[in-house]
Structure formats: C-alpha cells, structure tokens
UniProtKB/Swiss-Prot annotation:
Protein name: Small ribosomal subunit protein uS8
Keyword annotations of the record: Ribonucleoprotein, Ribosomal protein, RNA-binding, rRNA-binding
Subunit structure: Part of the 30S ribosomal subunit. Contacts proteins S5 and S12.
Recorded superkingdom: Bacteria
Gene: rpsH
C-alpha cells in the first residue's frame, strides 16, 4: 500500500502508542522521520530513538518518555501542513505553541528546526507539526 503522507503516519503512530503508554514504537525509516525524532529528543518529548538498518528501508525505533508518576510527556501532537493544504510561515511569523510550552516543527532551508531554533536563526518555512 502506498502511503500518501508518511509524516502524518509517524505522528499518528506516536500519538496512538503514547495514549496506551507503550514504551517504544517502530516505524519505517526515512531521513525526514529521523530528523523529526531528533527534534523530539532535543526538546525532551521522547527518551531516545535508534535507526535499525536492514536490507530494505530500515526501521526507526522511538522510545517514548513518561514522567515519574506515569503521566504522558506528549499531551498532544498535530499535523499542520498537509499534502492537500501546505502551510508556510515567514521568519517573523513562525508560530508559538501554547505560548512556548509546546513546539512547532518547521521545515526550513537550514533543515528541520523547532520553532525556537527557526526564530533564533531568522528563517521561515513549512510548518509541519505542533507538539505539546
């Protein structure tokens, strides 16, 4: 089956695994998914991730993070720019998520960045997702 939006599939898998409190999840790997996982790790939303090489596409394993009393660290994750409706933001219009409590993942000319990194580098781009 052909996947029309692999980023939305990744975010849905993370949301579903998080809701049932799985320790980890696996999904087909790609460079953009690896970069999204790296941003989520840098911002403290996931514990870690690893890329498992096989003879095909590879598998990205993401380890979800929970607080000491089993509360979810990711309370929401939403795809913003979709294949049917792209959403772009200029450097001075990069959105804040929950007034800085969450992040926006932005695809820029400097690669994938969080909203804070995009603002500090003064670059805009396509707003891929919100995570809070």
């Amino acid at each position: 089956m052909v996947m029309t939006d692999p980023i939305a599939d990744m975010l849905t898998r993370i949301r579903n695994a998080n809701m049932v409190k799985h320790e980890k999840l696996e999904l087909p790997a790609s460079n953009i998914k690896k970069e999204i996982a790296d941003i989520l790790k840098r911002e403290g939303f996931v514990k870690d991730y690893e890329l498992i090489e096989d003879n095909k596409q590879g598998v990205l394993r993401i380890f979800l993070k929970y607080s000491a009393n089993e509360d979810k660290v990711i309370s929401g994750i939403k795809r913003i720019s979709k294949p049917g409706l792209r959403v772009y933001a200029k450097a001075d219009e990069v959105p804040r998520v929950l007034n800085g409590l969450g992040i926006a993942i932005v695809s820029t000319s400097n690669g994938l960045l969080s909203d804070k990194e995009a603002r500090s580098q003064a670059v805009g781009g396509e707003v891929l997702a919100y995570v809070w």
